Amino acid sequence: EKDEIVAEVVKPELPDIILRKSKVKSGQSDVLVVGAGPVGLTLAMDLARSGVRVTVVEVRRFGEPPNVKCNHVSARSMENFRRLGVAPSLREAGLPEDYPNDVVFRTAMTGTELTRIPIPCRKNRYTERGGPDTEWDTPEPPHRINQIYLEPLLLKHAVAQDGVTLINRTQVTDFVQDEHG
């Protein structure tokens, strides 16, 4: 049929995620999200919680490492992840709980330290008050997690949501909308 997208969703290299084969016809999805990075997956989960049927299309194979752009998740994003039920699993991922998160500027890799931005380690994130973002009144402080760890966790939560269809190895090259959607 002219109005259907057909794609076989391959099993990602992630142990406990099984994706389904997808055949999505016009009208079976309310929203098309292009890109299964952190923003696309978060949007899909949020819409699905509200009963919106979402199809997420990604050019990469699921589980393929991303071109990393994220290394630190803000408090506001963590609050949203808390609302979506994914914050606890994100907090457990990334750097070890006692690993220093400070940002240091040096003249060279082993050169003179110019300045340091203190960021509490994961185990002290809720209690420590030293650093640029520790005084905020928030139930979810910022979290240091690289996108290579963040994305698989978001994918795992997104695929578990009713109303979310994930299609990988598919590139959107054109989009047409008419009076019917």
Predicted segments with their positions:
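Extreme N-terminal leader/targeting segments of oxidoreductases
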Residues: E1-L32, D46-R53
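N-terminal Rossmann-fold NAD(P) dinucleotide-binding loop
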Residues: G40-L41
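Glycine-rich FAD pyrophosphate-binding loop
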Residues: D46-C70
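Conserved dinucleotide-binding and phosphotransfer motif residues
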Residues: S50, A160-D162
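Active-site-adjacent segment of FAD-dependent monooxygenases/related oxidoreductases
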Residues: P66-C70, S74-H157, V176
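General small-molecule cofactor/ligand-binding pocket signal
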Residues: R91, T165-I167
